């Protein structure tokens, strides 16, 4: 299963409807094909999707919407999904997830969700209604109509027959079983501010050597229900730990984060799934971040169409992109918006980091007035 587009209406934090495309918006030249994933003849998907914006612009919120939509089509109960918090107390949120399945059909799943406060004061979410549309991709005349279902009747609608289904699980579960299809999701949303390595039986030595060449051995062992961590640095005695949190005393947060990330990258490239990373530059140096992006953009390595979806503050990372349509600019001006860069910047030959930092794109640089107020405040506190 490949996600083509996600739209969301009625979200409390957003200024207008959210609309994110994962397929190319601009014309695809021969030289572009090396960094894209070919879905079918004339349709290509982005392998690395960037969401950039200043602090508090809403980048994490956009990532949460994507995570929620992916988990809905994966049949996860909404109330078990961490990203459900983006729904807030909304009474009517409509999420449409457009995807391409194993039968070579383009599908649109529309899920309407409502929040209700429980006795404990927490919000509990349920699906009010659901519809599924589908069409063979062979019937699509051009990219313009790829996700257009205007005038078409749904092939399925949620009804009382779904009584056996929990009211927070999508009825797309039946479609997925019939098509023998699913979507693999790996998320680093919860690891943005946590540096604890989860138990893993296999940490590739190549990953460890790339992140920290001084490490000779790092592996987990489980004996009698207890976990032991074996850590050895070159020319040093082996250290044995029994708590993953203790690794922080020996390894940098960048190395721990890197091991978590690159272990997931291996899985995503193998399965053709999705890796969501919030603040990709957090704890990483720029070289490691660009390496990660290049792995996904290498169509020879990324044969199965694994997709990296990330947020960043780093404008320099935009220069890794030859195209504009794999980048979204996130702003928060009385509500969050996410706009595809190809709609704002028509030419690919303008250096993207310069356009971003110069303020040419509007709302991408901290306001000068706020900067001056901060400077005056600091000056007053020093005097």
Could you tell me what each predicted segment is?
Residues 2-67:
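Pre-Walker A-like glycine/lysine-rich segment at the N-terminus of P-loop NTPase domains
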